[in-house]
């Protein structure tokens, strides 16, 4: 055993003194020990009292170590049964390394193990994912004449299941039958859980019937494990059929099983089925809990059914099922997204009245709401409030507030938040950088936008196609086409595929810079790249031709567009109408206006402004203005 223990097993006692030091201090300072270490003082005979069931349930780790010290110093030594009680109690604290270390000390003191001791150690090694050492202990105990029992094999089974050796776990259960061990419900439950861990759902479900055939009745935990595993995989129909199977087998499903299926139905967007199952469980007298309600409220909120979600909140309060932070946060987020910030604020106030502390999700949702309604000072106040409550913002919270400031043209405050993120040890993500780059371009700070892009790359944050589109759009709009072309060429050579919007940015940039031929070449190359032009990119190219005075090319592309099945939009018609008006072609512009109106579009602000100016100059009749509106 000693050799097994020394194979890399050292008890982790970072906050505790080593056992050797503890024992040394006990000998030196405590009157519990005689000089010879043989006789206990009158106060220490009662270690047996400390090993009573009630005391062990409340035993603290420090006290357990002290108690072990008392026991090994006691004469005569306590029986192995007494030591087993203590080791078992420590194992239940999940302090497996300590159990192994104490077991090693017992061996050094020549305290012989019994089967129960070996089972404790095997379980600890398995729980530490050290199956080879568990098997070594098994080998040693069998050499000493101890036959493994169902507890031994169940521990090993758990070790196999969690050690990515599921086939050996299945083989072990088969071997148990051969060896005439009778696997119990716990054994099967362990294997079922292991099968789900290794994505063997069908085998796990089949094991239920195999259990029954072997005379072992599945219990609530068995079904709960299978239902949970199936729901995580999205096999909800099978989970529902198991629910019916439970009813036939006179096993009453509990709130946990119903909630698991309801949550899965919600996750897979079957909200009405989830509500029906909720009603079914209620009719059967199974009282829903806060988790059940939270699943449904969250799902209803995601569907924009915030009024139904609010009714569920009222229902749970009436039934004295206390909503928690998850409940309120889901509703607050839904109200914010629906633009109902006043209702969201009322819910927040209700949370505070109920002494429910908001979490980062609550604060982030409200901050987003304030930003959406241009209430940036209140958003900043909420941000500062959450920090004062020791609820520290994450990258998403910062991104929300930075976006709000950038949208309001308060980019410097957004930059200040960006710097604050770094000071807090948070690294901005792609969204952070995209927001700042776009905000800086919109604020006219082209140079700083480029610097932030360079910082993004140097910080190892990967730009995405949105980043490149923002960068290219900004460069083109500020007349830096040459730089944009360099970036675009790099993008084309990279593994990242430009999308239709990226191509549109470049074509528009080329056309506005007077390089219509280059824009046309890029447009023509789209089909070779497998990109189908949409109405936006057609309109951009038509606008480029019109700007250059290439009326025939614009008309030809307009016809091609319709033949291609791409319907013109308001922008397409207005672009062509303005071009015809500039050329003085009243008849052609009138025809286009009629066609546009028949498609349900009207003149945009630019077209109407042009017509009004031409009316004042006497170049157009009033009928044109009436036609447009």
UniProtKB/Swiss-Prot annotation:
Source organism superkingdom: Eukaryota
Gene Ontology terms: cellular component: chloroplast; mitochondrion
InterPro entries according to UniProt: Pentatricopeptide_rpt, PPR-containing_protein, TPR-like_helical_dom_sf
Keywords from the UniProt entry: Chloroplast, Plastid, Repeat, Transit peptide
One of the GO biological process terms: mRNA processing
Transit peptide residues according to the UniProt entry: 1-41
PPR repeat spans: 79-113, 114-148, 149-183, 184-218, 219-253, 254-288, 289-323, 324-358, 359-393, 394-428, 429-463, 464-498, 499-533, 534-568, 569-603
Predominant localisation class: plastid
Subcellular location field: Plastid, Chloroplast
Coiled-coil region(s): none
Family: Belongs to the PPR family. P subfamily.
Descriptive protein name: Pentatricopeptide repeat-containing protein At1g62930, chloroplastic
